[in-house]
Amino acid sequence: MSAFIIGSTGLVGAQLLKVAAESNKFETVHTVSRRPVDGRDKVQGVVETDTAKWPEVIRENSKGVRTFFSAFGTTRADAGGVENFKKIDYGINYECAKAAKEAGIETFVLVSSLGANESSMLFYLKSKGKLENDIIALEFPRTIIIRPGALLGKRQKSQGIANEIFQKWGNMVKGTPFKFTAYPITGEEVAKVAVHLASEPLTQGDGPVVKAVGTSELDHLVKSLE
């Protein structure tokens, strides 16, 4: 069985690549990214700077792939505004998900966000919620949505002063009774949970399986995997 990852150069995605490549559940791990990924055994990476071509790369490189992970995302500041954010964070993710569905992927894992809700008054959370709902509507045999809180770890690019403050606070409260104020979790922990859940046997039921994993369950799973 093989896996495919987009967002493999980000905080969570880089850890996903590492964990998936080290897992005995996957024979090959495919990626498509705008810059090269760390070379590892089992990893077959395609560098394509034009993200509009990613869906075709996915269709052409998904033979034997049963699991797809998306940790791809951006911020409104990096995107250069609301409309570009939609095109990148929502648009690229959704087009890649459609390509994965067409390629016969069985399990789709989306790293989303705490508070994602299409009815939210906050643009970021509203967009994340719409992405979740639209991917669910594609009806993969199994869809897993992971909604982490404050993501801890080293980023290749600063996400702004607000994010830096939130991350510092998350580091302070992680493992304390005050963790509920940020629900901090490392990129590596998210990756381990994602690979663990995606590796569970897929049972054929009456219809598509949708599993949403919030902060409390994430915390429990992280502890169980230690």
UniProtKB/Swiss-Prot annotation:
Q: How does it sit in the membrane?
A: Peripheral membrane protein
What GO biological process terms does the UniProt entry carry, in alphabetical order?
Answer: import into nucleus
Q: Where in the cell is it found?
A: Mitochondrion outer membrane
Gene Ontology cellular-component annotations: mitochondrial outer membrane
Give me the segments passing through the membrane: none
Q: Which UniProt keywords apply?
A: Membrane, Mitochondrion, Mitochondrion outer membrane, Transit peptide
Signal peptide bounds = none
Q: Please give the positions of the paired cysteines in each disulfide bond.
A: none
Instruction: Quote the InterPro entries the UniProt record gives.
Output: NAD(P)-bd_dom, NAD(P)-bd_dom_sf
Family indicated by similarity: Belongs to the FMP52 family.
Per its record, how is this protein called by name? Protein FMP52, mitochondrial
Species this chain originates from: Debaryomyces hansenii (strain ATCC 36239 / CBS 767 / BCRC 21394 / JCM 1990 / NBRC 0083 / IGC 2968) (Yeast)
This protein's encoding gene: FMP52
